[in-house]
Amino acid sequence: MAYSYTEKKRIRKDFGKLPNVMEVPYLLAIQLDSYRKFTQADRPADERLDIGLQAAFKSVFPIVSYSGNAALEYVSYALGKPVFDVSECVLRGATYAVPLRVKVRLIIYDRESSSKAIKDIKEQEVYMGEIPLMTDNGTFVINGTERVIVSQLHRSPGVFFEHDKGKTHSSGKLLYSARVIPYRGSWLDFEFDPKDLVYVRIDRRRKLPATILLRALGYSAEEMLDMFFETSRVFLAEDNIKLELVPSRLRGEVTTFEIKDADGNVIVEDGRRITARHIRQLEKSNVTELQVPAEYVLGKALANNVIDTNTGEVLFECNSEITEEVLEGLRSANVSEFQILYTNDLDCGPFLSDTLRTDPTRTELEALVEIYRMMRPGEPPTKESAEGLFQNLFFSNERYDLSAVGRMKFNRRLGRDEETGEGTLSREDIVDVLRTLISIRNGQGTVDDIDHLGNRRVRSVGEMAENQFRVGLVRVERAVKERLSMAESEGLMPQDLINAKPVAAAVKEFFGSSQLSQFMDQNNPLSEITHKRRVSALGPGGLTRERAGFEVRDVHPTHYGRVCPIETPEGPNIGLINSLATYARTNNYGFLESPHRKVVDGKVTDEIEYLSAINESQYVIAQASAATDGEGRLTDDLVSVRYQNEFTLKAAADVQYMDVSPRQVVSVAASLIPFLEHDDANRALMGSNMQRQAVPTLKADKPVVGTGMERNVARDSGVCVVAKRGGKIESVDAGRIVVRVADEETPAGDAGVDIYNLIKYTRSNQNTCINQRPIVGPGDSISRGDILADGPSVDLGELALGQNMRIAFMTWNGYNFEDSILVSERVVQEDRFTTIHIQELTCIARDTKLGSEEITADIPNVGEGALAKLDESGIVYVGAEVGAGDILVGKVTPKGETQLTPEEKLLRAIFGEKASDVKDTSLRVPSSVKGTVIDVQVFTRDGLEKDQRSLDIEKAQLDQVRKDLNEEYRIVEGATFARLRSSLVGNLASSGKGVKKGEAVTDEMLNAIDRDDWFKVRMADDALNEQLDLAEQQLVERRKELDERFEDKKRKLATGDDLAPGVLKIVKVYLAIKRRIQPGDKMAGRHGNKGVISVIMPVEDMPYDENGEPIDIVLNPLGVPSRMNVGQILETHLGLASKGLGRKIDNMVKQQREIAELRKFLGEIYNEIGQGYKIEDLDSFSDEEILELARNLRGGVPMATRAFDGAAESEIKALLKLADLPESGQMSLFDGRTGDAFMRPVTVGYMYMLKLNHLVDDKMHARSTGSYSLVTQQPLGGKAQFGGQRFGEMEVWALEAYGAAYTLQEMLTVKSDDVNGRTKMYKNIVDGDHRMEPGMPESFNVLVKEIRSLGINIELEQDS
């Protein structure tokens, strides 16, 4: 097998027993694909599909004027080029976007002609605002911040049938309902009430009898009954009543009379329930009519209008209940036969018939008016308005759209064959929904499960952006329609008709302030990936936290392989925000689907099919871990399978599909937890959430016990530099990597040089540090997709969120009580958990009413010392070390002119005009921050003169750009000439300077002539002459292009910045803060085992083993049993084995053993013990590569134990044995303070520990003096306000309990809100007198005022 550049350097031993059938797909595909479909930027305008922007334009255009004499048609759209690149946008606080230009055509028709003759056509490109572009990593830069648009899981459009679970009515009766949900438009609900009448609601308004809707659709009462009921014929004679007998309809009824056959034999006795046996006898006896007593017919309903044949008048309307009078009337009218509705209580209820009786309307118009009244109460209805409203509700394309998904779901649910159709509803659609609802109420069919993933779909970025864009276009449409009528007369152009502001505003609002447009979580590469793969049920058109019940949040069987059952936040959002499973993707309809291998006749094939939750339940699907033989046949007689959302056992021959991988169930974060299968789900949830909070450490350290997913996450997250093309490394420094591309990957006319600029010490959204470090050296060969530089939390191309620490599970003097963690001082000395945080502090100079603020080093009443770190422009130097309270940017603000006292006037008169009054409003370092200034950026308003510092920064940036571009040209030039040299040498020349005709060109010849003269050389072979001309032309073009790029950059830097109104200048100062680990910091493992550091002990006091090696971290063993996360113990054992093997390899390297011996030992580790599916091909490694591999393994042999397919206990023991370590994983430890051995052996090993972004430095602060609340005059709370610690109700009770009266008085008065007491106390302390005189607390005055506001007067009486 082929190894990538980094894999060769450090192979991870894989314990997986199952073959890797399918590579993990690109993890950001859901974001990138969705937005690519939205913009279709890579397709030519005429080949664009009807999706995304194209669909939005097509749905709104053409816009026709009210008179119909003018129309505006859409032709195509084009996306421009972004003004700034991503990094410039972040720096300037701009949005990374491209201008959208739309080509539209204005057509004016001739008014006079009868047929629509075209009078005039004008075509023009119109600017339609900017469309934010997605960066390569699936994020958006909006106003300078990186944001992510989270996908939304919402209810799919379509029709749903459900019941209220008996909650509505006290009797507990199930009330069924049906709901038609469109993609946009009014919702239509049908529902039963406790009396079994059917009602309809539109948009959840007041309910009306369902028959009103049917009447409004143009159905008469007779047609309604005919559609929903079967009829029975009744023959009416003078003395008897006979019923046409359909035996099957009698099933389950209790007879009130005897039923006899033609011969008079009794088939069913009186009072018996009719069974299937009776029905068979009746069918045999060929009885067609049955004489029934009159009572049988009473209470039934007529199926048709009964009409007097002579006069034609309606005697009895259909649906009339049959009473004695009705029977008499029928007999007297000589009606011999009529039809009644066939109903019974079992499977054919009289619901619609009963509803029709309560319906007050008689005609279609009355029904329309009734609906109008319900939708628009208080407005007088007219025939036209009522018809128009009803037409627009469900039958107009503008107002109603089921969408392709909705139509597909709708037709499938109603059992129709075709999956496509109109986006609007038809009469038949509504009738079918009602019919299905009634049959469900009759006990035929089942209700839907709304939490089934076949009924919930994912709306990704592209789709949401398209919806917002359409909203903007619809607003534009209204304005355009009004202007179009003017266009006919005034000869306007399309430009004058379209105002793009509403579109731009809608798009901007969506990206800037939608609930689903979130500030990207950029703690580490994993948190970025997880954020982009998140699926939220909240947001516009989704659920709200308060309303979401338990069922929506719960894990559903259809989540298997689509949504992770583990990773979800704890707290109010649990279950509403989920993460996509590793292999899941969305299909064209937006439903999540998961890959499966096809199984044919018990043999597993490599053919992979994606199944959505809708299709999955009908198949029999085996687990990925099902046993197979060498040919892929299932070996077990009974295989554990999933079928119809249940787990069951089936014969091997019945299996139709098989899972692709055991980790397809979990998300990326959960699949990074080793031994996940041994952890309790709640702890695994915490583990996967806490990995996202790990802060990138100064030196990344790969986990020795991993899962094999680390490489995928690092590669796909976008924090590393990945080679676009293969080749050789030309040069490397800390800031850039230059690759000379291999010939086979270089297209003709390309210089074949790739230059990668690295990101250095940049601030992330979470104030952590983003920095890339090259891992390749000059001369290294690389191929496409190899990792060239590690990003934050990446080590040799693998995700490395924390550090491998030597830990012991034991108690130690109570320092690890309640999950506390005891840490050795060695961890601090080695900077294992030292992290760099970068803070951005901003100083803004504004234009105020009293004059403009000024950034200057001339600050009133500030000593020389405080200004030492500022330059002449008043801005701090880069590299200065600053602490709390230091000035970073000097700024003065004009003060209001105060009224002068006579004395001041006199002084002014004597000493002349004093400097204008300004106050110091400089930017200072916040309390508890100490760091180094690493960068300063100055932005000046366009039109203002730049200060010296801005000019210096600008010059430095320009020099850097010029240097980069020259370097780039030099490299390209070198590569070009090297290529030419290889082509020319050895071939015959025909003319040129320094060469002789007919001679073969040599290296010496070429070295002798000037490079510019190379192009003048003519060769005998014309192909070579062409190559020379092409190369010359390319170099000229490249130079030109680089010069243009330089000029462009220069222009951008020279023009002023576009700042907010009233802002003159912005200075941004970036501070790098180094944070060592200290007591109070939060740490965690990957198994949900979190704790706070209680103390940092000297190394000599820590427990140590027989070899004198001390422990780094001591954890509490009581944290394991109750939490049931045993994975951490297995990780500790395997970590110990890994480090032990590393130590053995280290010794072999130090002793300079034979390479063959090393090779054999490595083979033993990788290919003998715990032999997985993957066999490492060490024979393909050269001796140098084996030696380099061995050197990289000295710190521990990395292991991969995948979720549900990991290392077995026996394998861990075998590796411990190979490493010459005790198989129990326990060893005797000695107390560092006394040297005595502890009572029993202790579990010692290596665990991967993370430092979480909950640092004590960010949380702890102390208040000395600070601001007070305005009304209560009590100190504020919280770190941001520099607030105090609240002495609350319970604390007061504690002091009361101790009887500490004076302390309590002090707390409630001078230390809180006794204003006069505070001042007096301050004076006393200044005078050296430490007495306190408490006064009246301000909060008491507030209470008095509040009581007075109720009209009760309270006054305090003075004690005389």
Swiss-Prot record:
Organism: Teredinibacter turnerae (strain ATCC 39867 / T7901)
UniProt key word DNA repair: no
Gene that this sequence comes from: rpoB
Keyword Transferase in annotation: yes
Ranges in coiled-coil conformation: none
NCBIfam families: PRK00405.1 (NF001616), rpoB (TIGR02013)
GO BP term, example: DNA-templated transcription
Pfam families for this protein: RNA_pol_Rpb2_1, RNA_pol_Rpb2_2, RNA_pol_Rpb2_3, RNA_pol_Rpb2_45, RNA_pol_Rpb2_6, RNA_pol_Rpb2_7
Protein name, per record: DNA-directed RNA polymerase subunit beta
